Amino acid sequence: TDLGMSPTELLLSGISMCKVATIRNVARRKGIEIGEVNAHLSQIAKRNADGTFITTVDSEISIEGNLSDEDRKLLIHEADNCYVTRVVRGEWIINDSKAI
């Protein structure tokens, strides 16, 4: 059934949107003129012998505009350190659900 985005797609979408918003925000603050910004993320999850997962996320970002290499590197660096990316890279403690 087609019920919309999967939970994994929603997670990747959140990271992607954070990266795009960060690029737009930094460009505006620095006076860098940009056009359309797109981010495409993909992930591969591998199960370890103990049942845990190692997940690799790859990101491709396109920024339209006549940007210098320095500006492009700055914007992508900032995108790679956006809030949601930093949260996901951090250590998580996910407690078991409680019945209410």
Model regions and ranges:
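Extended beta-strand/beta-hairpin segments
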Residues: 1-13, 23-100
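Alpha-helical metal-binding/catalytic segments enriched in His/Glu/Asp
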Residues: 15-19
